[in-house]
A protein has these predicted regions:
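Terminal domain-start leader segments
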Residues: 1-51, 82-92, 110-113, 119, ...
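Flexible, acidic/His-enriched mid-domain "rim/lid" segments that flank
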Residues: 3, 79-185, 196
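Basic, ligand-binding patches in group-transfer machinery
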Residues: 191
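Compact, glycine/acidic-enriched structural inserts
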Residues: 53-86
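Acidic/histidine-enriched ion/cofactor-binding microenvironments in catalytic or ligand-binding pockets
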Residues: 44-46, 185, 198-212
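Short helix/loop capping segments that flank catalytic or ligand/cofactor-binding pockets
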Residues: 31, 61-62, 106, 199-202
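Structural motif
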Residues: 23-25, 54-56, 75, 98-103
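A generic local secondary-structure boundary/capping motif
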Residues: 9, 31-32, 86-87, 131, ...
Length: 212
C-alpha cells in the first residue's frame, strides 16, 4: 500500500470508519497515478483491501497504471457507484466515509442501494489536506511547469504581430508548450484581443486578427 493511501486509511480509521469511497477524478489520479479521463472510476479503500472500480474500456489501463488495487469492472446492470456499494457490502464495511460534495444524489442512491447494512457518512475531503502539503518531487514538478510556461511564452512573443489570428497564436503557444515537455492544459487556451474579446476573461481563441 503506497504512503498516500496508507495515510488516508489511517485517518479514516481514526475517525471510526472502516472504509472510504473516493470519486473525485483529481483525487483518484493523485492517489493511484491513473491518467484516464475523470469520471470513469471510483475507489473503495479499506484496511484489508483496496478496489478500483471502472468500466471495460479502462480495465487494462487501470491494471497497468495502478498498484495495490483490485481492478473491478462494474457488472451488468450496475454502474461505478452501485458496484462500489456492492463491494463494500461484500467486504463487510460497516461505516464508510464519503465526500458528499463529490457525489450527486443519484450517485449516493446507487451507492447505498447495494449496501443496505453499510452506513455511509458524508464528511469533508480526506485527500485535499494531504494534497496541500507538497513533497520535494511535487515542488520540482511545479517548478518545471513554471519553466516550461515561461519559456513557451517568451518564444511566442515573436509570433504576436498584426494580421495573425488568435487561433494561430493559441496553436503556436500549445506547440511551444508541448515541445518543451508540457503534457496538458487546465483549460482551453485563452487568446483574446480587441475591445470585445479582450474584456472577456474566459474568451476562446477566434479567427479575429490582431490589430494595432
Amino acid at each position: 500500500m503506497n504512503t498516500r493511501i496508507q495515510k488516508i486509511v489511517d485517518a479514516v480509521k481514526k475517525n471510526g470508519h472502516d472504509g472510504i469511497v473516493i470519486s473525485k477524478g483529481s483525487d483518484i489520479k493523485y492517489l493511484t497515478g491513473f491518467t484516464g479521463e475523470y469520471g470513469v472510476a471510483v475507489l473503495l479503500l479499506t484496511e484489508k483491501k483496496n478496489y478500483f472500480v471502472t468500466d471495460g474500456r479502462f480495465e487494462f489501463q487501470a491494471a497497468q497504471e495502478t498498484e495495490g488495487f483490485e481492478v473491478v469492472v462494474h457488472g451488468e446492470g450496475l454502474n461505478y457507484f452501485s458496484q462500489t456499494g456492492k463491494l463494500a457490502a461484500e467486504a463487510g464495511v460497516k461505516q464508510c466515509a464519503i465526500c458528499g460534495a463529490d457525489l450527486t444524489f443519484d450517485d449516493y442512491q446507487d451507492l447505498v442501494s447495494q449496501a443496505p447494512d453499510t452506513k455511509f457518512v458524508s464528511e469533508g475531503s480526506y485527500v485535499e489536506p494531504l494534497r496541500a502539503i507538497k513533497t520535494p518531487e511535487e515542488i520540482e514538478t511545479i517548478e518545471q511547469a513554471c519553466r516550461i510556461s515561461e519559456r513557451s511564452f517568451y518564444a511566442l512573443l515573436d509570433v504576436i504581430k498584426p494580421g495573425v489570428t488568435e487561433i494561430d497564436i493559441a496553436n503556436e503557444l500549445e506547440y511551444q508548450f508541448r515541445s518543451r515537455g508540457g503534457s496538458g492544459f487546465c483549460f482551453e487556451t485563452i487568446v483574446a484581443s480587441g475591445p470585445d474579446n479582450g474584456a472577456n476573461c474566459h474568451a476562446t481563441a477566434s479567427d479575429r486578427k490582431i490589430q494595432l
